[in-house]
């Protein structure tokens, strides 16, 4: 049987350009009967813009040519007879198969194999488009690996400098939308919270991250947590064969010297892959913050210098075994350590009225020991009995061990700096957390029009927290306690997607049953305080998408999601922060639930999103008066939040040497506070703007300029956040066919990234301010060697201009 001859480069380019011009006509043909199919990559994802050709046999006359859409789908008019189906796309082996056609039908999915080449054979003659931000179907993709963010240091630093993502001084991560944010890595939810989550993100090197995907309305296969949306950190996939090593080393400086290194080794065959990795980040991090409050007519001014001296270390091993196309086993184990001392120095001026200084409190927190040790272990198995069916099982175990020892001398002085008295406090909190999870997922795609997802998940969380508190060497039984928290979850979900020509409908439901138990044992009482809870909740989602043509798409999305309280926020005990401020948990916190609807429109490289969010049982940390001169911070369900928002994302190559992307958001917040005896409503508009520019300079140097701006906006309760923003600059250049790369960047050039806010509640007027060591200069060198198998190789200008 004769075969279609290899198509030379010029003919291939011409046909591909013609296919691009005729893309809208090809997509319009979906409304008609025809020959349908899908082209998938090695991970089972649809390949965009693959060239699909149909040639008659035996004369090899080319009958049809088209390209696949973003889901890897293609469509031909009906033909009768024997034909040769040929599929080509850069970076993958050419696919050819004899087929017989007689009527409209859906062909089986076609999986392309990556083309394996050596580094010395790769000749790049043009530059791939490098937008930092793109958007489609209501999702925003931040392309970390092709921007300066890959040199930022760790995952937490990447999130801090990513458009549309905010990270406060406590490490809390949020989006512009209402509610909390759930963090995923490669589609797997991180069950960690608070300090534990920050610890993990600080030990995840930015060099490992491929991209970040933000989704405000994910389907039911994702957990219900994250009422504001989810952030999915997608790590770089190993597309290398043989033995390969990559290593990077960086140094940074502004206020403190920092150094980070990571090393990754992999050995891959057709049947199995083994990977080892190590990274560390060493150096101090400085923060300055404070507040001014007027309580019952008396003013206090407090300023704090904070230096975090902890270092991070991480090591891991990955093993994957795939004996055939149907079975795959994956094992992963990592250990992360965040350890080291720390110190804060606080000076508080205490006034009688607003202008008469009467006392000065000087407090110091000396963290003589801080250690967070984290183990993550995962085992997963994937079975594909056929090309349209996939079953997967996974088991995860995460252990977190956190310890701290803090000495806190407090000294009181008169206005003329004469000593009055001093106290010496000591605290020793310990925290042990174990998280176990079992998951089973099922995916069935009988044809190109239907897809079914289903799964079950069960998790067990155990958190044991204890704290020893001493004053002047004597145990303070009123502030020493042991808090135990246990949580059991059983979840099940189903999602069905149906495509009719240009219309796609998807609906899903996730069910969650949660049982909680908490026990507080105080040293002042033999009786333990216990609380239990049982909840059954349903979380539906729905989306409808209409493909107007090849460049225009409109979608309507709805989802219901939640945020659960942090474990430590449920501890009802009272902790001393300094002699004028306290923190107390709340065992009666309820999850906050968000209903969200979004209308999304995509036109070529422009995406527009209009959304409305309603957050019930909203909880946040608030500051209230405590006695005549003290304040207490606690977390409460305080009412309802509503938000109307409009987002626009645009990315385009403006010239052959300039890639541009921008993200604009306009929002209107309504906080309806209704708790205890407090009733008040706060309304405020706000806006967000980010822009990223990538320039190709002479000598192959890439220059990147990125900036973000947040306007004045309503905070969590009665406070108002002041405007903030930052500008980053980056330079990088590669040698040796990309094996050697050097990057120089400066973050927050003008040192404008701050967390300032103010607010008034009853007889409390509070204004706080702060900033971290966000401005720094970083130099990073990356080197890799070995034989690589690239997922895509860009070889010619015409193909690259299409990207």
Label each region the model flagged.
Residues 51-55, 88-90, 106-148, 168-170, ...:
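Short, acidic, small-residue-rich periplasmic hinge/interaction motif at the N-terminus
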Residues 57-73:
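Short, acidic Ser/Thr/Gly-rich low-complexity loop/linker segments typical of extracellular
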Residues 75-77, 155, 161, 188-216:
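Short acidic/polar hinge/loop motifs at secondary-structure boundaries
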Residues 108-111, 155-158, 173, 197-201, ...:
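N-terminal periplasmic accessory domains that precede
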Residues 224-231, 239-289, 309-313:
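Outer-membrane beta-barrel translocator/receptor signature
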Residues 314-338, 366-521, 547, 551, ...:
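Face-selective signature of the C-terminal outer-membrane beta-barrel domain
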Residues 431, 481-487, 533, 562-616, ...:
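Outer-membrane beta-barrel signature, preferentially recognizing the C-terminal barrel domain
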Residues 637-713:
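Gram-negative outer-membrane beta-barrel transporters
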């Amino acid at each position: 049987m004769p075969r279609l001859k290899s198509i030379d480069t010029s003919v291939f380019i011409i046909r591909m350009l013609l296919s691009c011009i005729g893309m809208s006509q090809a997509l319009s043909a979906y409304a008609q009967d025809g020959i349908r199919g899908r082209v998938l990559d090695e991970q089972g994802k649809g390949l965009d813009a693959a060239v699909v050709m149909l040639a008659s046999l035996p004369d090899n006359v080319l009958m049809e040519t088209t390209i696949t859409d973003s889901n890897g789908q293609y469509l031909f008019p009906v033909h009768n007879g024997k034909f040769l189906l040929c599929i080509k796309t850069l970076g993958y082996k050419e696919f050819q198969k004899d087929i017989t056609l007689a009527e409209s039908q859906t062909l089986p999915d076609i999986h392309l194999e990556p083309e394996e080449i050596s580094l010395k054979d790769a000749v790049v003659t043009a530059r791939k488009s490098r937008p930092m931000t793109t958007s489609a179907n209501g999702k925003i993709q931040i392309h970390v690996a092709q921007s300066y963010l890959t040199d930022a240091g760790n995952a937490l630093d990447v999130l801090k400098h990513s458009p549309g993502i905010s990270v406060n001084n406590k490490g809390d991560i949020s989006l512009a939308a209402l509610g909390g944010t759930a963090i995923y890595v490669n589609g797997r939810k991180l069950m960690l919270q608070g300090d534990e989550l920050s610890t993990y993100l600080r030990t995840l090197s930015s060099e490992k991250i491929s991209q970040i995907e933000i989704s405000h309305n994910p389907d039911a296969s994702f957990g219900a947590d994250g009422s504001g949306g989810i952030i999915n950190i997608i790590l770089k996939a190993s597309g290398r064969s043989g033995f390969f090593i990559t290593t990077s080393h960086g140094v940074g400086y502004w206020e403190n010297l920092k150094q980070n290194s990571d090393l990754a080794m992999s050995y891959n065959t057709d049947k199995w892959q083994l990977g080892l990795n190590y990274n560390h980040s060493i150096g101090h991090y400085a923060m300055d913050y404070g507040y001014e409050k007027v309580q019952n007519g008396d003013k206090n001014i407090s300023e704090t210098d904070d230096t975090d001296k902890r270092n991070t270390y991480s090591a891991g091993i990955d093993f994957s075994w795939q004996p055939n196309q149907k079975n795959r086993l994956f094992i992963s184990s990592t250990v992360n350590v965040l350890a080291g001392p720390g110190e804060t120095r606080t000076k508080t001026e205490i006034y009688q009225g607003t202008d008469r200084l009467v006392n000065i409190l000087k407090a110091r927190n000396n963290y003589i020991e801080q250690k967070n040790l984290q183990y993550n272990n995962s085992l997963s198995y994937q079975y594909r009995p056929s090309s349209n069916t996939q079953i997967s099982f996974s088991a995860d175990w995460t252990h977190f061990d956190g310890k701290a020892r803090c000495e806190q001398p407090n000294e009181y002085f008169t206005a003329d700096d004469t000593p009055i008295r001093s106290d010496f406090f000591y605290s020793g909190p310990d925290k042990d957390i174990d998280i176990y999870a079992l998951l089973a997922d099922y995916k069935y795609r009988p044809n190109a029009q239907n897809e079914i997802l289903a799964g079950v998940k069960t998790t067990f969380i155990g958190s044991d927290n204890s704290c020893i508190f001493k004053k002047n060497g004597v145990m303070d039984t009123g502030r020493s306690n042991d808090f135990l928290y246990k949580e059991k979850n059983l979840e099940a979900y189903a999602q069905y997607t149906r495509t009719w020509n240009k219309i796609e409908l998807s609906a899903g439901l996730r069910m969650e049953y949660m049982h909680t138990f908490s026990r507080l044992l105080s040293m002042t009482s033999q009786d333990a305080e216990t609380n239990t809870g049982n909840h059954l909740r349903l979380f539906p989602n729905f989306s409808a998408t209409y493909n107007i043509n090849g460049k225009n798409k409109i979608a309507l999305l709805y989802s219901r999601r939640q945020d659960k309280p942090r474990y430590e926020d449920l501890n009802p005990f009272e902790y001393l922060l300094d002699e004028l401020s306290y923190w107390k948990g709340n065992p009666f916190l309820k999850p906050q639930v968000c209903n969200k609807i979004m209308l999304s429109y995509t036109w070529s490289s422009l995406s527009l999103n209009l959304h409305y969010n309603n957050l019930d049982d909203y909880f946040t940390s608030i500051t209230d008066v405590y006695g005549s001169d003290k304040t207490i911070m606690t977390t409460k369900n305080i009412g309802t939040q509503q938000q109307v928002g409009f987002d626009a994302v645009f990315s385009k190559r403006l010239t052959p040497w300039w890639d541009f992307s921008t993200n604009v958001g306009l929002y209107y917040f309504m906080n309806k506070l209704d708790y205890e005896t407090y009733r008040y409503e706060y309304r405020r508009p706000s806006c967000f703007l980010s822009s990223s520019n990538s320039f190709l300079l002479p000598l192959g140097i890439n220059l990147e300029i990125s900036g973000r701006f947040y306007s004045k906006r309503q905070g969590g309760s009665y406070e108002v956040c002041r405007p903030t923003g930052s500008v980053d600059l980056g330079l990088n250049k590669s040698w040796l066919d990309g094996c050697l790369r050097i990057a120089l960047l400066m973050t927050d050039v003008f040192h404008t990234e701050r967390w300032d806010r103010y607010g008034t509640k009853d007889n409390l007027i509070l204004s706080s301010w702060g900033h971290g060591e966000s401005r720094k200069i970083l130099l990073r060198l990356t080197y890799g060697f070995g034989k690589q198998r690239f997922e895509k190789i860009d070889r010619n200008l015409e193909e690259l201009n299409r990207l």
